[in-house]
Amino acid sequence: MLSTDLLFFYRQVSHQVLTVVDVETTGHQPDSSRVIEISVLQASLESGIHHQQTHLINPQVPVPPSITQFTGISQEMVAQAPLAEDVWQDYLPLLNMGTLTAHNLSFDYGFLQSEFRHLDIGFTRPNSEQLCTVILARLMLPDLPSRSLPNLVQHFDFPIATSHRAEADTLACWLLAKLLLTEIQNESDETLLDRFAKQWLSLRDAAAILGMSTQQARAALKRSHVKPRLVGQYRTPQYQRGDVEQLFRANQSSNQLSLLQDF
C-alpha cells in the first residue's frame, strides 16, 4: 500500500472495536504444533476495554521444556485444562467480531485457522478487518531498534508484569494499538505522511510498491540514487518509504507521458 492508502486504512481502524488475540503454543508451525493458551480482549478507543477472557488448553501433545521455560506453562498446568474442542467453540463468536488484532498477526491467525480446522470449522477474516501491531509499529516507530512486544512494553513503560503469557500479551498489544491509533486520530495528514515516509522497507516490500521483481527494484532504486541502509550480519538493504514512493510516482508520471505520446 501507498502511504495515502495506509493513512485511510488506519484512520478507519481507529474507530473500530479491536478484537485483540494472543496464543501460546507448543511450537512455531501451526501444522505441527498446538495452542496451549488463548486470550481475547475486546476494546475501542472510544470506550476502552469491553471484555477479556483467557483459557489454558490441553493440547493432548507434550509441551516441550523450551516452551515451558519461555512461557511458564508446564505439562502439569495444561493437563488440568479443558480440551481444545471444549474451548474453541466459545471463542469463535468473539474472534469473528471487530478488527482481529495481534502483535505479529500472521502467527496468531495461522494458529487460529489451524485449531478451527481440527474441528472442521472454517475461520477467515478479510484483510480489511485485520490489524497487525508489528506492521503498525514499523510504520509509526521506524527508528526504534526493536518492535518486539517486550521491548515496546519496556520502551513505553506499559504496566505489564510478565511477557509470553496470553493475557498479559493481549493487554500489551491493546495498549500499543491504543497509543498508536490515538496518534493517528489526532495528528494531521501532513504530519502522519511525513512520519510514514521515514519507515524502512525491505527490498521485497519496496518491490511490491514499485510493482517489480526484487532484482528490477534494486536496479531501479540504484539508478535513482536511492541509498539504502544496510542492517544485520548480512548487510541487508532497507529503503525509506518516502524514497520508494517518490520513485513510484516518477514511474507513474513517465508511463502516463508515454501513453499521451502514443496518442
Where do the model's predicted regions map?
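Short alpha-helix plus adjacent loop in nuclease-associated cores
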Residues: Q130-S146
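Short alpha-helical "recognition helix" segments of helix-turn-helix
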Residues: D205-A207
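Short helix-start
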Residues: K227-S258
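Conserved non-catalytic scaffold segment of RNase H-like nuclease domains
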Residues: M1-Q113, T124-R125
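Acidic, Mg2+-coordinating catalytic module of metal-dependent nucleases/exonucleases
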Residues: T99-F111, E115-F116, L144-L203
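Non-catalytic pre-domain segments flanking phosphatase-related domains
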Residues: M1-Q16, K222-K227, Q252-S258
